[in-house]
């Protein structure tokens, strides 16, 4: 039906007869001439109808936005004065000789001239995806997956599919359950990741595996989360953590070079402890130049409990954040930042405004200066390298609250004051995470997952001091987003059972949930390691959007609903009966 795409026509096509198929993007009726912008997935081209082709001109008068049409015509060069430098096809136009209206369009529920609500865009997603910016994002996504496949094939990886209907295993979020009609009362689970299957593939001898795969997690959603999402899943045998990172870094550098024309360079490597200490985050945005500075040792003896308490508490921390030029902040802005850190558990926000350092106490403005002597203030200013015009904010509490609150404040202030260089790309690896973290109920939970190997520890050493264990794990972070994470896996049965025990999984439960894995570990398991990238998040970064729904063709809302198909929906009672399922309403509390 077509010979060319609208958006691919150039001066090299001048004089050629072409047939185009697409949609009316815009129509301008000048009486004796009618112009339309015609659009397909590759872009837009201007088509015009003149009186010499009367039948086509007459039919063109009926055109309206989003009519699906076919046009045959001749490509012509535009006059110099009519060239549109904002269009890729702006140097040419098509003189139409024939027009076919393939399908007409009703009045549109989306307005191309105004910003539509996200609810409307998701309800009429098939119309929203016609917009050039949305089409471009999905084309970029397709390019990314193509580049990934070629890279992985070239590096000896095998694309192997793993099951979608599997067994529920604890991986940190709730599973989506699928009832079995054949096995009454039993359920499959949709995979949160192919984690155990890819490890089993390594035990099967496949050495290098990858898969671009759908995963499912029934968890509370955020702006950058979806209940179903896509991973670039990777696993290797006989490779160390640095070797895995080297190959995966090469993949991401390849993507950025091919898609953005940007060489990311070598990725710096930072430990979890350093990232938390300097940036208050395990996924630091290195485009922001500000860092946290520990000042607890300077404040242990002050008669100000807000500072002295955490300064003398082994689990406490007092950190300072120097904001270049921050002395210009108003009291209202400072109060807003004080309220902001309370979201993260902080009780408030102390500060020192540095007006003129040379004037000593008279050169600063601070509500806490009365609790600190000149010597301590000068020591703080020295340590933070404060200059005239700077602001110093303080966080004082337990280590987690200080890291969370001051890390978030660092990002917010950096964005608000234009200190974060948003023209840059700042990738890094974060390594050496704690293996376990407090579950809030007196126990431990795996920071990554229970199949991650500890670093330089025997099973006996791990059992004796799990709180000291460092995971042989690594996350890739770009511009403050965790785009991928992985680890060296446990390949020894005793170590795996030790980890399960630390996590409170008794031997009976281990056999019930992971018997197949524990059995497989008995038969010459190779050392193996891997990683998974979030394809949606990678595409988000490479297309310049901050909304993950912009890079998924048919996404869910933050309530895990599809507004277009109205999923989820109530099931047919007959289907439920076949599955031996009965929906029971919860009793309402009076």
Swiss-Prot record:
Keywords for this protein: Aminoacyl-tRNA synthetase, ATP-binding, Cytoplasm, Ligase, Nucleotide-binding, Protein biosynthesis
Amino-acid positions noted as binding L-aspartate in the UniProt annotation, renumbered to this chain: 171, 217, 448, 489
Localization of this protein: Cytoplasm
GO MF terms, alphabetically ordered: aspartate-tRNA ligase activity; ATP binding; nucleic acid binding
Region of interest (Aspartate), residue spans: 195-198
GO biological process: aspartyl-tRNA aminoacylation
Domain of life: Bacteria
PANTHER family from the UniProt entry: ASPARTATE--TRNA LIGASE, MITOCHONDRIAL (PTHR22594:SF5), ASPARTYL/LYSYL-TRNA SYNTHETASE (PTHR22594)
Assembly information from the UniProt record: Homodimer.
Family according to the record: Belongs to the class-II aminoacyl-tRNA synthetase family. Type 1 subfamily.
Name of the protein in its database record: Aspartate--tRNA ligase
Organism: Escherichia coli O139:H28 (strain E24377A / ETEC)
Lineage: Bacteria, Pseudomonadati, Pseudomonadota, Gammaproteobacteria, Enterobacterales
């Amino acid at each position: 039906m077509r010979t060319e795409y609208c958006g691919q026509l150039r001066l090299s096509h001048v004089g050629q007869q072409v047939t185009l198929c697409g949609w009316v993007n815009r129509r301008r009726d000048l009486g004796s001439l009618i112009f339309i912008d015609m659009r397909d997935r590759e872009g837009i081209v201007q088509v015009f109808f003149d009186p010499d082709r009367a039948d086509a001109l007459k039919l063109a008068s009926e055109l309206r936005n989003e009519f699906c049409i076919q046009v045959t015509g001749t490509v012509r060069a535009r006059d110099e004065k009519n060239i549109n430098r904002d269009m890729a096809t702006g140097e040419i136009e098509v003189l139409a000789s024939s027009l076919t209206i393939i399908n007409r369009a009703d009045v549109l529920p989306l307005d191309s001239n105004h910003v539509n609500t996200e609810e409307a865009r998701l309800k009429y997603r098939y119309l929203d995806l016609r917009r050039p910016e949305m089409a471009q994002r999905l084309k970029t996504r397709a390019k990314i997956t193509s580049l990934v496949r070629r890279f992985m094939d070239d590096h000896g990886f095998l694309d192997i599919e793993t099951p979608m209907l599997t067994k529920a295993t604890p991986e940190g979020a709730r599973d989506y359950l699928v009832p079995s009609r054949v096995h009454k009362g039993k359920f499959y689970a949709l995979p949160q990741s192919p984690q155990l299957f890819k490890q089993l593939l390594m035990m099967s001898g496949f050495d290098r595996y990858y898969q671009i795969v759908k995963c499912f997690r029934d968890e509370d959603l955020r702006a950058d989360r979806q209940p179903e999402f896509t991973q670039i899943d990777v696993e290797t045998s006989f490779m160390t953590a640095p070797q895995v990172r080297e190959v995966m870094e090469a993949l991401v550098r390849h993507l950025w070079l091919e898609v953005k024309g940007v060489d990311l360079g070598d990725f710096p490597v930072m430990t979890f402890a350093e990232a938390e200490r300097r940036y208050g985050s395990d996924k630091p945005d290195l485009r922001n130049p500000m860092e946290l500075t520990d000042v607890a040792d300077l404040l242990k003896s002050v008669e100000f409990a807000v500072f002295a308490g955490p300064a003398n508490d082994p689990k406490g921390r007092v950190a300072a954040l120097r904001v270049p030029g921050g002395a210009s902040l108003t009291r209202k802005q400072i109060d807003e930042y004080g309220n902001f850190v309370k979201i993260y558990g902080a009780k408030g926000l102390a500060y020192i405004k540095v007006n003129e350092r040379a004037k000593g106490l008279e050169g600063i403005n601070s509500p806490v200066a009365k609790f600190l002597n000149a010597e301590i203030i000068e020591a703080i200013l020295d340590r933070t390298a404060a200059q005239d015009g700077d602001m110093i904010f303080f966080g004082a509490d337990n280590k987690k609250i200080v890291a969370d609150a001051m890390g978030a404040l660092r990002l917010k202030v950096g964005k608000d004051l234009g200190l974060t260089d948003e023209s840059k790309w700042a990738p890094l690896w974060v390594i050496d995470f704690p293996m376990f973290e407090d579950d809030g109920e007196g126990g431990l939970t795996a920071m990554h997952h229970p199949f991650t190997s500890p670093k330089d520890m025997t099973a006996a050493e791990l059992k004796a001091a799990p709180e000291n264990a460092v995971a042989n794990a690594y996350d890739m972070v770009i511009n403050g987003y965790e785009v991928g994470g992985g680890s060296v896996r446990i390949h020894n049965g005793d170590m795996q059972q030790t980890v399960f025990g630390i996590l409170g999984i008794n031997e009976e439960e281990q056999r019930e949930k992971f018997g197949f894995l524990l059995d497989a570990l008995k038969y010459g398991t190779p050392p193996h390691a891997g990683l998974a990238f979030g394809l949606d998040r990678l595409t988000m970064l490479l297309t310049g959007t901050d909304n993950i729904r912009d890079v998924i063709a048919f996404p869910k809302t933050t309530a895990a609903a599809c507004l277009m198909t109205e999923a989820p929906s109530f099931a047919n009672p007959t289907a439920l009966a076949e599955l031996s399922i009965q929906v029971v309403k919860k009793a309402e509390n009076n």
